[in-house]
Amino acid sequence: LEYCGYLKELYGFELNKEDVKNRRYSISRHFLDHVVELKPQAELIIQALKKQEIPLALTTTTSLFNVQRYQDNNQNINAKISFDDDFALILTRENVQNIKPHPEIYLNVLEHFKIEAKDCLIIEDSLIGVEAANNAGIEVVAIYDQYSAHEIELIKARANYFVQDFTELLRHIA
């Protein structure tokens, strides 16, 4: 609520802190339910890896609440994938003490699947995600993301591999 008060003061909103908070959450819910989309061809990567019987984990610094909103309400996403069917493991910020770039979330994946880092490959779209994979000692494929474009050179330098999109990655794994 203090943050909403800060926004009110910073931007001169005529709304009170509570109204700013309500408006913020309304916009956020709309974004989660209707705007967020999978990266193009992501579902094809998921299908290809599942066809090869490779267990998949979804690891995210977002909240479980947001993941559930994507799954339950976002037709852009749930028309293409099923979180429950497509991922053997889903870990969110609530499952770890330390979020990315700390390696904890990826170390938990290794432990869950009882595998070594050399038997795992991470697909990431952010610098902190690439750093988390590096910190866990796991090879990482970075994929271009418009929201990480300002860090693209660092991402390319720290990732083991870089692809522009999932179509490019699909050519290597199919």
Explain the meaning of each model-derived region.
Residues 54-56, 60:
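A structural preference for short, pocket-lining loop segments at secondary-structure junctions
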Residues 1-52, 68:
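N-terminal helical cap/lid subdomain that shapes the substrate entry/recognition surface
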Residues 33-37, 58, 100:
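Short, surface-exposed alpha-helical recognition segments that flank or form part
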Residues 47-50, 63-174:
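Asp-based, Mg2+/Mn2+-dependent phosphohydrolase catalytic module
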Residues 40, 55, 101-103:
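Proline-rich intrinsically disordered, low-complexity coils
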